Amino acid sequence: MSTLVIQLPEHRRLRARATDEAAPDPGRRREYVYVTSADGIEFEAQGDAAAALLPRASQVIAVVRETDVAWHRITLPKAPASRLRAALVGVIEDALLEDSESVHLAVAPLAVAGEQAWVAAVDRAWLQDELDALQKSGVFVDRVVPMAWPDEPPMGHFHVAESADPAAPGGTVLTWAHLDGVATVRLDGGLAHALVPQPPPVTTRWTASPTAAVAAEQWLGAPVMVMPLEQRLLQAGRSLWNLRQFELARKTRGARAARDWLRQAMSPAWRPVRIGLAALVVAQIVGLNLWAFHQKNEVQARRNAIQALVKQS
């Protein structure tokens, strides 16, 4: 089964607020970094494109950047599915930085009621806007996953901050994901060293993007495995997470089946079938018109015969 994994653009709300800029235009042209894979492990193609130009695939996964997800660890309330979101809000409302109605929540996979579980929080309007923009271009997202999530063993990934110069101070950041949460901090200053236990756990998996590898090895004092963005997107796609829960849950199976059938029917491979069906419809219309014309002539002939018989009588 072919898989398309795309990275959602960075949520710029906080940056716009800080600079008193206007909110981004909903109709702006979005460019998506993407990768395709047949097995979810090795990528076949990669690049960036507008939504309408993205490759088609059997499954589409959207990845949310680590800085666009907040994490809350709670005791999962015991509530029916229809009331679970309200129960979650009741537990973490005081910890939310914004109004609960503007936040989308998602529960960790395999979470058990009454036990500790992680809840992901994302700006609802922003995520809905991104999903709508993709859907309008014919890209239907099956799953939404975080780029990083609380996990064991710990993982540290070095990469360049959005729109930053990798050679500039603070250009390189570290995303530290472990059992106690996820945090992304700049390498300059002491916050990164304070965040990571010293010495780091021996089981820690260290990776870096190609542009951040040198800074990562200087900071860490040890070699790191280079992981391009394409591999990192596939890694995120293999997780069990799915942020499409509650009000953002995907459509029903019936609607999805109809949508997938329509998408397949409009694909280039089905063009001969479409042409054949169109020709069949045209032939049927022409045939019906000829039959109607023939029937009309027969009726008129009978009418003329009856009129002639009446005159003779």
Segments predicted by a language model, with ranges:
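Hydrophobic/aromatic-enriched cytosolic interaction surfaces used to assemble or bind macromolecules
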Residues: 1-313
